[in-house]
From Swiss-Prot:
InterPro entries: LPLAT_7/PORCN-like (IPR049941), MBOAT_fam (IPR004299)
Pathway listed: Lipid metabolism; phospholipid metabolism
Keywords noted in UniProt: Acyltransferase, Membrane, Transferase, Transmembrane, Transmembrane helix
Superkingdom of origin: Eukaryota
Organism the protein comes from: Drosophila melanogaster
Cellular localization per UniProt: Membrane
Membrane topology recorded in Swiss-Prot or TrEMBL: Multi-pass membrane protein
Function: Acyltransferase that mediates the acylation of lysophospholipids to produce phospholipids (glycerophospholipids).
Name this polypeptide is given: Membrane-bound acylglycerophosphatidylinositol O-acyltransferase frj
């Protein structure tokens, strides 16, 4: 474990410990100041002088949110925050920036641009509501009334101080999870944190974090990624060994990510952040999907969960059968941001999936490995979907269970093979490794795609022949019936 990782873990543990103190501060304004102060302190400890990038980008993004008209503010803020990543990573290329500073900048980018998207969406609802009110002859049976909330109105009068507090709140400042500005406000305005099982939830997550950390340390010791870059690995190890090495290295990566994300969730749970009643139907990253403001009147009578701040559903990722399902459970808070702000708003439905994945790769970084990995995912998903229709969808019983296991093995091979590019990062390292295993992943997937297309066309042709035969038989029966009728007459 590097010194950066040690500092990172110490900061996370410190933030977890601070949660019980922060939650008890009665004055909401004071609690907000303390939370922001802790966040700034963590950023400076982890980043040093490089923390200036965070402050400069926040200032630029805040100016875009406040000064640009809401109709275009989300686009300008998006361009400013994601554009700053170019400068940030060029600076990193020449001068070097701590890896955890990069994560802080990534989360900050989502938060500031996310609040601009929230403001624009609220402004559009307000405009539509006003337009609806002006139309006195609206048919109530044809068009339901547009509902607006106090939150929609208040978003239009955001202050720079509020954006600063939201952006540098110590909860989530290091590695997330991403949460909406509404979730941040609810923490200070709603009483849910007082009645949520904060200690129990934190202890439960800490158990898992310790388990993941132990797995990470053990597997990283036995199968270090650096070994995959050594001459011995390429000269003395067999093709099979090199190919199978992607499994433990990606497992190590997952264990490391699970450890960090689970500790980040502990920061939230210990402070009671992101706790909502079950009745509010909270979603990862989004928060409540049902009305919940009235629930504060009897807050002590509800059961609570922390779904809003759960960033990765680990058991579902590990146990699900397909690559597509695994993607849905991975980094779900960030996926929510991408789905709402990129996928749904992209003007072309034909290209919006590609645009969303490209945005994700860009957000992760400019290294070739990010694009090999993330942009390769949809090609495997389309292959998997094809074979799912061919062999898995109609299977039952023992056959279905066997096919599920085969899909699960292929799922993890695909994750590991593509993930190896993410880990190796540079084009030279990626090409050297893939060449050493003869690009077997891409070649086998291309062959399976071709075979899948062939079998699909054969199945469709057989279905067409069967349909024509049935129609012909039905037609023949009709002619025979007509002949019999004539004879009877």
């Amino acid at each position: 474990m590097s010194i950066d990782d040690v500092i990172y873990v110490i900061c996370l543990l410190g933030c977890i410990g601070a949660g019980s103190y922060v939650k008890k501060i009665a004055d909401e304004g004071q609690r907000k100041l303390v939370s922001t102060g802790l966040g700034v302190l963590v950023v400076v400890i982890v980043s040093g002088l490089h923390s200036l990038h965070c402050f400069v980008s926040l200032a630029l993004g805040t100016a875009a949110v406040l000064l640009v008209h809401p109709s275009k503010g989300h686009l300008v803020t998006f361009a400013v925050m994601f554009g700053y990543l170019v400068f940030f990573r060029i600076f990193d290329f020449y001068f070097g920036i701590p890896g955890h500073t990069n994560m802080i900048q990534m989360i900050l980018t989502l938060k500031v641009s996310g609040i601009a998207f929230e403001k624009t969406a609220a402004w559009k609802r307000l405009q539509a509501h006003d337009e609806q009110k002006k139309n006195d002859q609206r048919d109530v049976h044809q068009e339901s009334p547009i509902e607006i909330t106090d939150y929609d109105v208040e978003l239009q009068s955001l202050s720079a101080a509020e954006i600063l507090h939201y952006s540098f709140n110590y909860i989530g400042v290091l590695t997330g999870p991403y949460y909406r500005y509404r979730t941040y406000r609810d923490y200070f305005e709603m009483p849910f944190k007082t009645y949520a099982p904060t200690v129990e939830a934190t202890l439960e997550k800490l158990k898992y974090a310790v388990f993941y950390c132990a797995l990470y340390l053990a597997t990283n010791y036995m199968w270090p990624l650096d070994y995959a870059l050594s001459d011995e690995f390429f000269n003395d190890r067999s093709f099979v060994y090199r190919l199978l090495y992607v499994w433990p290295t990606f497992f190590t990566f997952r264990a490391r990510i699970y450890t960090g994300l689970t500790l980040s969730e502990c920061v939230c749970t210990m402070a009671g952040f992101g706790a909502y009643p079950d009745e509010s139907d909270p979603n990862n990253g989004e928060g409540p999907r049902k009305r919940y403001q009235h629930l504060k009147r009897d807050a002590d009578k509800h059961t609570y969960n922390f779904t809003t701040i759960v960033n990765t559903r680990v058991l579902e990722v590990e146990r699900c059968w397909t690559f597509r399902e695994g993607m849905k459970h991975w980094n779900v808070c960030v996926q929510y941001w991408l789905a709402v702000n990129v996928y749904k708003l992209f003007p072309s439905k034909k290209y919006r999936t590609g645009a969303t994945l490209l945005c994700s790769a860009y957000w992760h970084g400019f290294r070739p490995g990010h694009y090999f990995c993330i942009m390769g995912a949809p090609f495997y998903v389309s292959l998997e979907d094809m074979w799912d229709k061919l062999v898995r969808k109609s299977a039952t019983g023992t056959s279905r269970r066997v096919i599920d296991v085969i899909f699960w093995i292929f799922k993890w091979f695909a994750f590991s093979y593509l993930g190896e590019a993410f880990l190796l990062s540079s084009f030279g390292n990626i090409w050297r490794f893939y060449s050493s295993v003869y690009h077997i992943g891409y070649i086998s997937w291309a062959a399976m795609t071709a075979l899948g297309f062939y079998l699909t066309s054969q199945r469709k042709a057989a279905e067409r022949r069967k349909k024509r035969a049935a129609e012909k038989a039905a037609g023949g029966d009709g002619i025979a019936a007509a002949i019999e009728k004539e004879k009877a007459q």
